[in-house]
Each structure stands twice: as structure tokens, then as C-alpha cells.
Design a protein with these regions (language model features):
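Single conserved hydrophobic/aromatic residue that forms the stacking wall/gate
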Residues: 1-7, 12, 372-381
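N-terminal accessory segments that target, anchor, or regulate ATP-driven/P-loop NTPase machines
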Residues: 8-9, 13-39
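Conserved ASCE/P-loop NTPase catalytic core
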Residues: 9, 58-59, 79-295, 299-302, ...
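Dynamic helix-loop-helix/coil hinge segments at AAA+ ATPase domain boundaries and subdomain interfaces
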Residues: 46-73
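Short conserved motifs of the RecA-like P-loop NTPase core
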Residues: 56-60, 333-345
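Conserved C-terminal helix/linker of AAA+ ATPases
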Residues: 89-90, 360-361, 365-373, 380
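Glycine- and Gly-Pro-enriched alpha-helical subdomains that act as flexible
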Residues: 308-315
Length: 381
């Protein structure tokens, strides 16, 4: 910025001088730092009249998410039906279509968050991610349930009608499961208590939200937000739920057809048989399961899937690095052995697709550090 002082017009202030170029640059940096909310004001918004069909939604997801075809089909249809129902208020129809919130079950790094974020990107709706583990019942240390809507409002730049058509992804929903099959006698402020608190948000109600987040206070001005048209997508790893599924299937496989039914069950992929009663056995209360009627699962990623994720998606980490080096006039190439090494480490660490980025970042750190000093115009890893 100091180089801009030479030959530039100066803005004079009591405490000193600042050149016109610096003032402009400082303003641009400040505006960028204020967040994406203001940028969204001029961005394309959701057009219900031109809502993408399920096949178009899935095609868009295919560009960013490798595999998980079953989950993508479920999401595409459910999201389409959710936003299509918003047209009902203009139709004068007496039949009220209820919204279908979604719950996705899958291990870490299988693409749950990416799927939700990509759908929001396609539809141009406000999107926020909430970690269920930080939520507590009202009156206890932690974040209130209403903080979910505060985050959504912030993303929408406090445009309430826009926020009321947004998408909320609640991650780690399995971490607020109650500890036993029976209702808790003692206060479970971060488990069953949070599930109870989420009910009114999921089913659709008007919630008074503190404008700047934090706890509610008497005489504080509130922002009413109707959650009726907000799509809630919940995700969790549900570690150990395969045992619940197996127990349920074993109790059903009795009688003279037992051997035949047992042969059909794929013990290597028990997740495909997941049902709402398994979520109940895991510790979700029946009321919250009923408000998450669309249940889908994501398969663990094998070596082939991880290899494809590394290079094929539109925003893959490898393509990102190639673009970054290209901006410095350097052509970056990778040998196949490097890809195999990255996949080996990702399998070893058991972090799924999420682990790919950290491994690539570690490998590329030295190259990026010396990009402007030592690297030739063609660089191979």
C-alpha cells in the first residue's frame, strides 16, 4: 500500500495523510471482510417458477460429489418437493403439503455436508451449518436452539423472507442422542433436552430470535422467523448403528424361511437396511424422527471413490492447486504415484474425503512457500 503514495492524490486528515489509492483499497478490503451476506443481496435468488427438476438437481450434484447415487436421488426428489410446495400458497388448493426434512447417516468424510452445501448453491438460498454438540437447553451454558436461526439470518443479511426459504444443515445430530432407550429421569441439557428444543423448529413455527445472537433478555427486541418453509437437513455418523440394524434384522429372521432371508442380507453393508426404528434404538426420540421423514444413508468411500474425488469433481483439491499455480504462470502436474500415496494415507487415517485435502496441503506446502522464488514454469509433483 505504501507504494501508492508516489504520484497519487492525497486525502488529508487531522492525524496524517492517506493516498486516494490506499483509501479505495482499504474500502474494498473492508467491504469484503464484512461478509458474504451483502454480496448475496445482488446475487441470483431462488426462483420458484424455474425450480430445477430432480434430474437436474442430481446432475448438478454429480459435478461436485462422487458416488453416493442413492443419497443424491433421495435429496434431489425431497428438495424439489420441499420447494415446490411453496407454490401451493398461490394455487388456492385445500390440500396442505407438509415439508419433508431430511436426515443423512454416514461416516465422517462421506459427503454429507458437501451435498447440502451444493444444493443450496444450486438454488441460491441462504445456507448455514450448525454443530449440534454446542447446543444446549435454554438457560444452560452453551448455544440456545434459536442461535441456529440467528446464523441463518446473518447469512441472509437479516432479510427475513429470504432466510425463511433457506437451508439449515445440523451436523453431528447423533451426538445429541439420549444415553439410554428409556426417557431420561435426570436433566440431559445437551442430549434429549436439545432434541425436544429442536422440535418446534423442525415442524414449523414462529420463533422469536435475538437480533445479534446470544441469550434472550427481557424487553429485548426480537425478530420473528417462521420456520415452516426452512429446509432442515441433519447429518451424523451414528457410529455403531450397524449393530442396531443387525439386531433388528436378526429378530425378524425367524421361522422356516430364516436361512433364505439370512442369505439375502449383505453383512458388509448393513447401512443399506437402515430404518427409522434403528434411529430410535440409537437414542433419537420418536418425535424428532417423525419430523425427519426422509432417511437416507451414505456409503463408506473405497479406494476407487477416493481416487476419483481427488481429481474428478469440478472443485477437486488437485484442480484447485493447478489453478493456483497457473495464476503464477506455472504449469503444475502430478504423477500417478502421488495420487496413490495420497489415497493410501487417506485410507490409513480413516478420514474419508475430508482427509484428502489435509494430506494434499501437507505435500504442497513447500512448493507453495517457494513458488515465487525457485519453481520453474513447469513443476511436477
Amino acid at each position: 500500500i505504501l507504494s501508492g503514495l508516489v504520484g497519487s492524490e492525497m486525502c488529508i486528515r487531522d492525524s496524517g495523510y492517506i493516498c486516494d489509492s490506499c483509501a479505495t483499497q482499504a474500502y474494498e478490503i473492508t467491504q469484503e471482510a464484512l461478509g458474504e451476506g451483502r454480496k448475496r443481496a445482488g446475487a441470483t435468488k431462488l426462483n420458484l417458477k424455474e425450480l430445477p427438476k430432480p434430474v437436474e438437481i442430481k446432475k448438478f450434484l454429480d459435478q461436485y460429489v462422487i458416488g453416493q447415487d442413492d443419497a443424491k436421488r433421495f435429496l434431489s426428489v425431497s428438495v424439489y418437493n420441499h420447494y415446490k410446495r411453496l407454490l401451493q400458497k398461490d394455487s388456492g388448493d385445500d390440500v396442505e403439503i407438509e415439508k419433508s426434512n431430511i436426515i443423512m447417516v454416514g461416516s465422517t468424510g462421506t459427503g454429507k455436508t458437501l451435498l447440502a452445501r451444493t444444493i443450496a448453491k444450486l438454488l441460491h438460498v441462504p445456507f448455514t451449518i450448525v454443530d449440534a454438540t454446542v447446543l444446549t437447553e435454554a438457560g444452560y451454558v452453551g448455544e440456545d436452539i434459536e442461535s441456529i436461526l440467528t446464523r441463518l439470518l446473518q447469512v441472509a443479511d437479516y432479510n427475513v423472507p429470504e432466510a425463511e426459504q433457506g437451508i439449515v444443515f445440523i451436523d453431528e445430530i447423533d451426538k445429541i442422542a439420549r444415553k439410554g432407550d428409556n426417557p431420561s429421569i435426570t436433566r440431559d441439557v445437551s442430549g434429549e433436552g436439545v432434541q425436544q428444543g429442536l422440535l418446534k423448529l423442525l415442524e414449523g413455527s414462529v420463533v422469536n430470535v435475538p437480533p445479534q445472537g446470544g441469550r434472550k433478555h427481557p424487553d429485548q427486541k426480537m425478530i420473528p422467523v417462521n420456520t415452516k418453509n426452512i429446509l432442515f437437513i441433519c447429518g451424523g455418523a451414528f457410529d455403531g448403528i450397524e449393530k442396531k440394524i443387525a439386531q433388528r434384522l436378526n429378530t425378524h429372521v425367524v421361522g422356516y424361511t430364516a436361512s433364505q432371508k439370512t442369505a439375502v442380507i449383505d453383512k458388509n453393508n448393513m447401512m443399506q437396511y437402515i430404518a427409522p426404528q434403528d434411529l430410535k434404538s440409537f437414542g433419537l426420540i420418536p418425535e424428532i424422527i417423525g419430523r425427519l421423514p426422509v432417511l437416507t444413508y451414505l456409503n463408506p468411500l473405497d479406494r476407487n471413490a477416493l481416487r476419483a474425488i481427488l481429481t474428478e469433481p469440478k472443485n477437486s483439491i488437485i484442480k484447485q492447486y493447478i489453478k493456483l499455480f497457473e495464476m503464477d504462470g506455472i504449469k503444475l502436474t502430478f504423477e500417478d504415484s502421488v495420487f496413490e500415496y495420497i489415497v493410501d494415507k487417506a485410507v490409513e487415517y480413516k478420514l474419508g474425503a475430508r482427509g484428502l485435502r489435509s494430506i494434499v496441503e501437507t505435500i504442497m506446502m513447500d512448493a507453495v512457500s517457494y513458488t515465487h522464488l525457485t519453481l520453474p514454469t513447469i513443476y511436477s509433483v
